[in-house]
Structure formats: C-alpha cells, structure tokens
Design a protein with these regions (language model features):
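Zn2+-dependent metallopeptidase catalytic domains
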Residues: 1-186
C-alpha cells in the first residue's frame, strides 16, 4: 500500500523513508489533489455563513495527503534527486500548477475568504488565527484572485510555463553543483 495515504505511524510522525518508493509519489499527488478538491468543494457548497473555522481552518486542513507527499518529494528533489525524480517533477509541475491556480483563482472560495477577512476585527481571533487569516487572504490576492477573467487566463498560462521552467532551472543548478570538482595541486 502507499505510505502517503495515511499518517506515518512512527514516533513524532517521522516519514518511513524505507517504505517510500518512487512509484508511490505520483498516485499520492493525484489522490492528494482529488482529496483537496473534494474538501474545497465542501467549503464552497457549505450553506453556512463563512466563518474562520468553516472556511479558513477548513482550507488550511484540506490537503493532508498532498501536504505529506509534497513535503517529502520536494525535499528529496532538492537534496538528493535522481533522474527518475527529476522526470517525475517535470511531469507533475504543470499538474500542480493548474491545481494551485484552480484554488487561488476560485471566485466562490475567495468570496468566502474575503467575507471572513472583512470581519476580522470583530472575530476575537488569537494572534495565530489572525496570522493564518492574513496569510490566506494575501496569498489569494497575490495569486490573482482579484484579476478579471481574461487576466486570470493569462496568469494560468504564465504559471504553467513557470512551473516547468522553475523545475528545469533548479535541476540544472543541482546538477552543476553535483558535478563540481575542486582540484588542488601541491
């Protein structure tokens, strides 16, 4: 079974690297995207008035599988990549970029976030909750939630291209660092 589909049953939730194989990553990303989409759909379709709990916290907790697999995968590709991991990262980059755009450019979801944000001064939030609300709201705004439809379509194109270029650049830097040799003559 795929170790990413459940929480790691180790002390402190440390990943079980001995159980993680290359073939586990892609299905975990795809299932994580599906899980987050379902959770976001539940947030959007909620008939309840948007609150910090049913919108901001729900969004923050919407992707346990995706968070788990992303944390490990991207650390592995940054620190100890292989040709197979590199190929997979290039394959997944546009998929993940599209998924992120589908969230950050979702007008119904942003409206709920904005509704909570506009009443932030009257919510009696803790400092941590205020930080999460500010971070969530600003992330959506900075990711294009306030752009018109035409601008959002262009942003999606740019993000898709950037995702692949960013991975390629990172891999080139890593390959050059790994190939570096220092010769010292006596």
């Amino acid at each position: 079974s795929n170790p990413f589909f459940t929480e790691f049953q180790t002390e402190y939730g440390v990943p079980s690297f001995d159980k993680i194989k290359l073939e586990h990553y892609e299905p975990a990303f795809l299932k994580g995207i599906e899980e987050q989409n379902q959770n976001i759909e539940a947030i959007i379709e909620s008939p309840e008035v948007p609150t910090f709990e049913n919108t901001i916290v729900a969004l923050d907790n919407s992707a346990p599988i995706l968070d788990r697999v992303s944390a490990i995968f991207f650390n592995m590709t940054d620190a100890e990549t292989t040709d197979s991991l590199t190929e997979l990262s290039i394959k997944l980059a546009p998929v993940l970029s599209e998924h992120e755009d589908n969230i950050s450019l979702n007008q119904t979801l942003f409206k709920r976030i904005n509704d909570v944000y506009q009443q932030k001064d009257s919510l009696n939030l803790t400092i941590e909750q205020q930080r999460l609300l500010d971070k969530t709201y600003k992330s959506f705004v900075r990711s294009g939630a306030n752009l018109d439809t035409k601008q959002q379509a262009r942003l999606r194109e740019i993000n898709k291209e950037l995702s692949t270029l960013g991975i390629t650049f990172s891999n080139n830097v890593l390959n050059e660092n790994n190939a570096f040799q220092l010769f010292v003559d006596k």
